[in-house]
Amino acid sequence: MSKKRLNEIARELGVSSKEVVAKAQELGFEVKSHASSVDEASAKRLAESFGGQKSEATKVAAKVSKPEKVDETPKVETAKVEKAKETQPVVKEEVAASAVQSASHRPQSRNFKAEREARAKEQAAKRAQNQGKGGQAKSDQDRRDNRQLGQGRSNNERNDRRDNRRDQRPEERKDNRFGDRRDNRDNRRQDNRSGRLARFEQREAAKPAGPKIDFKARAAALKAEQNAEYARTSEERFRQAQEAKKQPKKPKEIKFEEPVVESKPFVKPALVASVPEQVAETTVDTRRKKQARPDKKRDFNSDEEDGPRKQQRNRNSQNQVRNQRTSNWNNNKKNKKGKANQPAKPVTERKFHELPTEFEYTAGMTVAEIAKRIKREPAEIVKKLFLMGVMATQNQSLDGDTIELLMVDYGIEAKEKVEVDNADIERFFVEEGYLNEEEMTERPPVVTIMGHVDHGKTTLLDTLRNSRVATGEAGGITQHIGAYQIEEAGKKITFLDTPGHAAFTSMRARGASVTDLTILVVAADDGVMPQTIEAINHSKAANVPIIVAINKIDKPGANPERVIGELAEHGVISTAWGGESEFVEISAKFNQNIDELLETVLLVAEIQELKADPTVRAIGTVIEAHLDKGKGAVATLLVQQGTLNVQDPIVVGNTFGRVRAMTNDLGRRVKTAGPSTPVSITGLNETPMAGDHFAVYEDEKSARAAGEERAKRALLKQRQATQRVSLENLFDTLKAGEVKSVNVIIKADVQGSVEALASSLQKIEVEGVRVNIVHSAVGAINESDITLAEASNALVIGFNVRPTAEARSQAEADDVEVRLHSIIYKVIEEMEDAMKGMLDPEYEEKIIGEAIIRETFKVSKVGTIGGFMVVRGKVTRDSSVRVIRDGVVVFDGKLASLKRYKDDVKEVGNAQEGGLMIENYNDLKVDDTIEAYIMEEIKK
């Protein structure tokens, strides 16, 4: 059974919802509001209770729906007026018919739209009648009179009338007007919709049936005609457009807004009687919106919250929210009106820029930078790149190849800009225009003395310098490069002494790279040794001529011929045998044939034609560097080109500074150093690396910028090298986590010794252990080194340096081990022993006994106890056991307890009985075999 809501019943009966709800409650229905539902019987009963009211409401609706009769004064009728009179009854009949039809099934309400349309048609008919005999003037006069009459009315009278009408309303309507407003609005909408539908059906039925028109065919024919006309005129329009482009454009004149003056059309006088000239006003359509009159003032004194508007003071500050809302509304209205009245701004055309013929680019330029350079929009370039298959944004950097392809697409010749890297020191060594060929002068040769350990290199140099250098070296071996300069026959020769030990390979390679020729010292009694072969390879790699000095010919076992033959096997052939190397037999200890050796050196240097330009800024190589406690960073430099002066701004490796002081090989202070001159300088910020190049800059500012940039690049390179992981070294990286490492901090007197010691320690091969160099530097062991060693659990090794008093006391307090050495052999041996001791001990299994389970006992809260008898060896309390059943190991673990009778014992011997319990295992069975074993450490 269907149900109806009370509001639907109220709509059908034409009464308010409240009345229906009240009536339903009176009849005893359980309802709460107009949304409550009742069944059909209850709805019928409720409708019968409103029977009298329903018929009365229907009469009222029918009466309201009829339009008011308009008085018409007989005038001179024209054809237009007659037509309006004929159509007017039809409209009335349509409105009445629609009203009656809608009132039959729903409550009738006023159709305001139909009434407005009827009134408008009547007014139009009146105006048409008055036009013939001067009626227009009379109508205008009547309207002016009515307007003047309306102006005389005061606002107070209008307010009084509104209040009176409000008081005269019935109480029921006052109370119910807000509740029924929504229902009335819905009723009006339904009535309007039904009325429009009825009128449309009547008009359609009244139309005579004409021939059927094919609108699609007519539209297609019209479209074809328009296309044909457009095609005929397209050529003419194109020509006119081209001519318009060629003509210079005139600037648009800005038209100022003129005040709007209401037009007063001239009205012809009537022929019948002379009528005084009247000004006709413009017809105003009052159907849509009520037009505001400028002379009409409104006063809403009764509706103001703060009293009459005229009596308010400082009204803007009393209600800021309302004022803000009102001001926003007014601004919006003004803006809307202003936009319509403002003249259109002249549109400035974009200037057309010609593309450049050449474009100089650098790799990494962004799309925005390129667009700015070639005067194009970034979006245009992004589109071209997209068509080329490159997805880019305007802030994305492009590589050189992409930029060149883009310029080819634009038809521009692209050239890569060559930027000079101010931080690049190497360019001074390779630039052709850096040296002036006209200023080239002869320079002293740089000679490097190489050879195996204890073959007499330092003794030879000592003899050349007439000094005792070898006595100052620890262990009698040279452990860093010495640079010295001597004079022979009025010509200077610079000597570099390199270590012969295997740990100093990098130092020998460095010496060979800066030298002009090499003196290879070979002992006549020892012959060719491993470091001798290495020195030969370094010299050949540097393309340096070799002079062989066969030393120790005074010894009884000397055999120079054997040495010549061994060297020939390694590619060093004597000139006597048709080779290119000079051989000189000497005795450095007894000063034999030393002069002949020097003459040979000068002869080979003269053949090479060694020259340098002393006028340019100095460039060269770092031979050695160390940190002095009083002087700071001290670097031994070899000037290769130019002249080095005191106070020169200099960049050395990854550091910079100004030459504060300069001393020669004899320890004397000098102010200048020419080509091929070794000097020691101070004034650097940090200690450079041996083998770094140096260069003098124009000013300290550029030197500082270059040094900081080089330091930044070196740090970035180091970080990239440590963080880079590839598929190739991934396994090694994972495996390194299983290897034990010993952390070491190295401090030495010179940079070369630091490098040699670090390289030697990392080459120690002990399986399972590796050396990790935490920190290495030049200088004495200080407190920061001890702090770092404590934090990283490292060992501090000092090579030819001593710890400070503060560092020594801190090391004792923090229990940090510090080892001091002066011989590299002892450092390597000591580290090997320490690394071997770090290895995890290796164990092997040893079976000590075997027993058979004879009986089992299950004890609550304890577990299973196995009674056994030892059949071989013994079973100890600390041994591990295996439970073997039918030849299969079913459990492997530790003993929980071992007893003999009721006593706990440490072991049970052969052929003895006892009881045992196994940890975490209670499944012992008779005839199980118990195998006892221990793990013994394997001694290395």
UniProtKB/Swiss-Prot annotation:
PROSITE patterns: G_TR_2, IF2. GTP binds at residues 451-458, 497-501, 551-554. Residues 587-589 are annotated as: G5. GO terms for cellular component: cytosol. Residues 65-95, 112-125, 155-206, 232-258, 292-301 have a biased composition (Basic and acidic residues). Residues 497-500 are annotated as: G3. One of its GO terms (molecular function) is GTP binding. Residues 476-480 are annotated as: G2. The keyword RNA-binding does not apply. Residues 314-332 have a biased composition (Low complexity). Residues 551-554 are annotated as: G4. Residues 48-264, 278-351 are annotated as: Disordered. It holds the Pfam family EF-G_D2. Residues 442-609 form the tr-type G domain. It is found in: Cytoplasm. Disulfide bonds: none annotated. Keywords: Cytoplasm, GTP-binding, Initiation factor, Nucleotide-binding, Protein biosynthesis. Belongs to the TRAFAC class translation factor GTPase superfamily. Classic translation factor GTPase family. IF-2 subfamily. One of the essential components for the initiation of protein synthesis. Protects formylmethionyl-tRNA from spontaneous hydrolysis and promotes its binding to the 30S ribosomal subunits. Also involved in the hydrolysis of GTP during the formation of the 70S ribosomal complex. This is Translation initiation factor IF-2. It comes from Streptococcus suis (strain 05ZYH33). The lineage of its organism: Bacteria, Bacillati, Bacillota, Bacilli, Lactobacillales.
